[in-house]
A protein has these predicted regions:
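Acidic (Asp/Glu-rich) sequence patches and key acidic residues
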Residues: 1-119, 123-149
Length: 149
């Protein structure tokens, strides 16, 4: 019997390669200026219901307000989420009121250059996120192929 040796030719494990973290607020009657005033910061992008992305594009069905941070390893989801949250109010009553009127989402875009990457969020950060009364959404993209291993 011959022992086979499996050789890995690529990098496995480690922190995800690229991350986008976005707080997204949606609502039919959403006024982006009002949201900016309540949160004390300007959005990365926003629009009102009925506005158009460009001439000829369909009108938006609802208003939206987005604040996004992006980064690459070694800055992963934990660091970027903290950076995003530092720009937003910690007062939970603001978020309770917003969640009563609007759909709030914390969205993660996770990009990997190979098939095996990961990340963790600390208990303290998860507790802070919970005070936003938001859904969490994860879009995960693995652009590398199995030929890396």
């Amino acid at each position: 019997m011959t022992d086979k040796v499996i050789e890995f030719k690529g990098k496995v494990s480690g922190l995800v390669d690229e991350t986008n973290v976005t707080i997204a607020i949606y609502g039919e009657d959403l006024d982006p200026d009002d949201i900016s005033q309540q949160l004390g910061c300007q959005p990365t992008f926003s629009h009102r219901q009925g506005e158009r992305r460009s001439h000829g594009s369909p009108p938006y069905k609802q208003g939206a307000w987005f604040l996004e941070v992006k980064g690459n390893a070694p800055h992963g989801p934990e660091d970027l989420t903290k950076a995003l949250l530092m720009r937003l109010p910690a007062d939970e009553t603001i978020w309770v009121e917003l969640a009563r009127k609007y759909d709030i989402q914390m969205r993660y875009g996770i990009h990997m250059d190979t098939w095996n990457r990961g990340f963790e969020l600390s208990p303290k950060l998860v507790q802070r996120i919970s005070k936003l009364h938001t859904k969490l959404s994860f879009d995960i993209y693995a652009v590398g192929g199995n030929d890396d291993a």
